[in-house]
Each structure stands twice: as C-alpha cells, then as structure tokens.
Amino acid sequence: DRDSCVDKSKCSKYGYYGQCDECCKKAGDRAGNCVYFKCKCNP
C-alpha cells in the first residue's frame, strides 16, 4: 500500500523517483514523486 512506498522507496538527491513511482502505481495511485528525499504518492 502507499505507506509502504514511502518507507521502502529510495529517493536519491538527483530526483530519480522511478522506484517510488512504480510502487505508487502498484498501490493504485496515479504516480509517485520525491519530496525532500521522501516518496509521496499522488492519488
């Protein structure tokens, strides 16, 4: 679920958020983004 994406997904300092994005999509959200090195899902 989306909370596990926040914990699991690494957000690097150069904004690579593929892992976060993928996790959020699997959780049923539209996309994922990195905010202050944390993964956030966009419903």
UniProtKB/Swiss-Prot annotation:
Q: Does the keyword Secreted apply?
A: yes
Tissue specificity annotation = Expressed by the venom gland.
What's a Gene Ontology MF term here? potassium channel inhibitor activity
Its GO CC terms are:
extracellular region
* SUPFAM superfamilies tied to this protein: Scorpion toxin-like (SSF57095)
Q: Does the keyword Secreted apply?
A: yes
Tell me the Gene3D superfamilies matching this sequence: Knottin, scorpion toxin-like
Q: What are the entry keywords?
A: Disulfide bond, Ion channel impairing toxin, Knottin, Neurotoxin, Potassium channel impairing toxin, Secreted, Toxin, Voltage-gated potassium channel impairing toxin
Stored InterPro entries: Ergtoxin, Scorpion_toxin-like_sf
Q: Which residues cross the membrane?
A: none
Q: Which cysteines are joined by disulfide bonds?
A: C5-C23, C11-C34, C20-C39, C24-C41
Q: Which compartment or compartments is the protein found in?
A: Secreted
Indicate where this protein is primarily found. Answer: secreted
Q: Which Pfam families match?
A: Toxin_17
Q: Which family does it belong to?
A: Belongs to the ergtoxin family. Gamma-KTx 4 subfamily.
Main function:
Reversibly blocks Kv11/ERG potassium channels.
Annotated domain remarks: The presence of a 'disulfide through disulfide knot' structurally defines this protein as a knottin.
Q: What is this protein called?
A: Potassium channel toxin gamma-KTx 4.1
Q: What is the source species? A: Centruroides limpidus
